[in-house]
Amino acid sequence: MSRTYTTTAIVLKATPLGEADRLLTLLSPDQGLLRVVATGARKPRSKLGGRTALFVVGDCLIACGKSLDRLQQVETLTSHTALSGDLARLAAAQYLTELVLAQALERHPQPELFALLCRDLARIETQSGLEVLPYLLQSTWQLLAWAGWAPQTHYCCLTQQAVQPRLEQSRWRVRYSPSLGGVLADTAAYQRRPNQRELLLTATELAALQQIPTSQTVLPLASLPREAWQMLERALRHSAEYHLERPLQSALLLETLLTGSHVASV
């Protein structure tokens, strides 16, 4: 049996290990989630230093180990360095990465998940400030759909009654329940638990949410006010958190940016 193997992978997480090493969490299309040690990667002149930074995609040569495999060589394919140049881009990238980390399986091929993440990071990298939001929401929806968690937005998740946004009625609202799986018709009744999340969406917000999975292009940022984008992000995030059974830590930075008056570059 070979003691080494090669794979293409993206760095999802990198933490210091010992005096000079780096512990990496990688996602590979043919190996799934991998945890490997990059020996000496934190040394000033290490060839692995920049090649093991977050979001770097590379062809890797990995040696099998007793407890952890060791990364021996990396040939960088894409570095995504622009993601760290803008707080909104960085927050969106961390958001998607956290979702992927929660869904990926160790040592299990997941080419579609790998392709989705690489495509989404490349798209976000070309945006600035709040322009990342439409791309983030579409990417989040597709990751939820990949896992079988996409919310139901065209039909009531309890009665299966069609739900149409009444755009002519400014006060119209529809209930959105992450735990029940989507929107609720006016006639839908259930015993709501005290800690059960439920949001109220406007007609405009529901119409936009219904377009996200079917639109061939990303919705323009100017098509909705900031408050609407914030509500849509919250709805999809709550759906993800319900299935993951834990909060998305990276959403804190994104929410701060959404509620702030500007988005800064770093």
Swiss-Prot record:
Pfam families found in the cross-reference section: RecO_C, RecO_N
Keyword DNA damage: yes
Residues that span the membrane, as ranges: none
Superkingdom as given in the UniProt entry: Bacteria
Alphabetized UniProt keyword annotations: DNA damage, DNA recombination, DNA repair
GO CC aspect terms: bacterial nucleoid
Record GO biological process: DNA recombination; double-strand break repair
Similarity comment: family membership: Belongs to the RecO family.
Xref: HAMAP family: RecO
PANTHER family per the UniProt record, alphabetical: DNA REPAIR PROTEIN RECO
Function: Involved in DNA repair and RecF pathway recombination.
Protein name stated in the entry: DNA repair protein RecO
Species the sequence originates in: Synechococcus elongatus (strain ATCC 33912 / PCC 7942 / FACHB-805)
